[in-house]
Amino acid sequence: MATTPAEFTQQSLTYTRMIDLSTGIEHQAVHEPWPPSIRRLRHDVEGLEWMERAFGIERSQLTQSGGLGPAFEEVTAITHCGTHVDAPWHYGPTSEGRPARTIEECPLEWFFSDGVVLDLRHKAPGERIEVADLGAALAAIDHVLRPLEIVLLMTGRDRFLGTPEYFEQPGMTRESTLWLCDHGVKVIGIDAYGFDRKFADMAEEARQTGDASRIWEAHFAGLEREYCQIEKLVNLDLLPRPTGFQVSCFPIKVEGASGGWSRVVAFV
């Protein structure tokens, strides 16, 4: 059963281990269509030069650091690379008829709660994850959703990370997304590149039918219901049970942003 933030106690946070459910920000990662760039500023070059400029000293005077300066990294990346949280602003300028929240405006209470894993590994690439699939997955674990629970969709696609097959994913529909939201769920995560079906399938369907309403249908459900989604999770198969654990998925505060990177961790 999900608890409200006020009900969390030291006892309720008792856990035996933590499981990292995140991918990292990797330099020129092959699984990122817009790959990050990481410029590393070294102890003995750029860091040292900065020390000399900032403090007006020479290397020989840095006896306490062995003549070295600090290391820095200069990262160029979109907010939707690596494991990240999409804010309602990502889906459009409004949500539920109100101005959509950017990532730093989303309530902290959404991002730490009881977790539920739904096993959807039987869904083939390109298939839709329907309401019936979610209902069957919940019935299989004898669980009734509670408000603020963080629902994690296990497709198994993370095992293909770094290969072309990673982008061959099933995806949520408008109806299945709204169904979870109508149960009080505010955060839904998936261990795939994206939340919707693979791009090629959506594009081909629109080309053949002339109907583009199914493109990014799960994303655009956020225009009707306010929710966040986590993309590019990993290691959901390492969770020892489908319920009875807690998830932390606080996003980085990026001013006015449509998303933010997150180190998603399960406490089991």
What are the residue ranges of the model-derived segments?
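Active-/binding-site microenvironments in catalytic and ligand-binding cores
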Residues: M1-V268
